[in-house]
C-alpha cells in the first residue's frame, strides 16, 4: 500500500484525493492545510470550473497538519502530493525530497527552468521519483497528436500554434500574478508545451 500525504486541500488537492480514492493500492493517510474545517473533513467549500464540487470527507483516520514541515516528518508517508500554489512548489518539493519522500507535484513543477532543473537533480541525487501532474497526454486527442508528430504522419513538425478556449480557473485567485502563479502561460500553456 502506497501511503500519500496531500499538501494543499484546495481544488486540485480535491481532484487528486478523488483519484486516490478510486485506487486499491494507494491510501491518503495525511493532510496538510491551514484550514481547520478542511482538516475536520468539511471540503464543501471547494469548487472549480470542472469536476465535482467538494463534499464531506472522513478524515478521522488521517494524520492532520497545518505546517508542511510536520507533514514531511511523518515517517509512514511514501509520497507527498504537492497541491499548493505554484510559488511554493520548489521549496516544498525540495523539502519533501530531502525528507526522503517521493513527490507528485501538481503542474507547474516550478515557475522557471532553473528551479525545475534543481528539483530534477535533487530527485535523481536522492534516488527518488518526482512526477508532475500533466494530465493532457492521457487524453485521446493529445495521444493522437503525439503519435502523429512522433511518426511523422503529416511530415516534419516545423512549428505549432496553441489556442486554449477555457475560462480562468475559479480556484486560483492569483491566476494572473506572475510571481505566484506565472500567469496563463505557465499555469495552462505548460500542458501544451509539455507535449
Predicted feature locations:
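N-terminal glycine-/serine-/threonine-rich beta1-alpha1-beta2 phosphate-ribose binding loop
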Residues: 1-99, 117, 125
Amino acid at each position: 500500500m502506497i501511503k500519500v500525504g496531500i499538501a494543499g486541500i484546495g481544488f486540485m488537492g480535491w481532484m487528486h484525493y478523488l483519484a486516490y480514492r478510486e485506487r486499491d493500492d494507494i491510501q491518503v493517510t495525511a493532510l496538510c492545510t491551514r484550514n481547520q474545517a478542511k482538516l475536520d473533513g468539511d471540503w464543501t467549500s471547494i469548487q472549480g470550473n470542472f469536476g465535482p464540487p467538494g463534499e464531506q470527507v472522513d478524515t478521522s483516520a488521517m494524520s492532520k497538519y497545518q505546517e508542511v514541515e510536520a507533514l514531511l516528518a511523518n515517517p509512514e508517508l511514501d509520497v507527498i502530493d504537492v497541491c499548493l500554489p505554484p510559488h511554493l512548489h520548489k521549496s516544498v518539493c525540495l523539502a519533501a525530497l530531502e525528507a526522503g519522500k517521493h513527490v507528485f507535484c501538481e503542474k507547474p513543477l516550478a515557475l522557471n527552468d532553473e528551479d525545475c532543473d534543481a528539483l530534477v537533480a535533487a530527485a535523481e541525487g536522492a534516488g527518488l521519483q518526482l512526477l508532475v501532474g500533466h494530465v493532457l497526454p492521457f487524453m485521446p486527442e493529445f495521444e493522437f497528436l503525439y503519435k502523429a508528430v512522433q511518426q511523422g504522419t503529416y511530415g516534419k513538425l516545423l512549428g505549432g500554434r496553441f489556442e486554449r478556449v477555457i475560462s480562468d480557473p475559479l480556484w486560483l485567485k492569483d491566476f494572473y500574478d506572475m510571481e505566484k502563479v506565472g500567469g496563463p502561460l505557465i499555469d495552462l500553456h505548460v500542458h501544451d508545451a509539455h507535449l
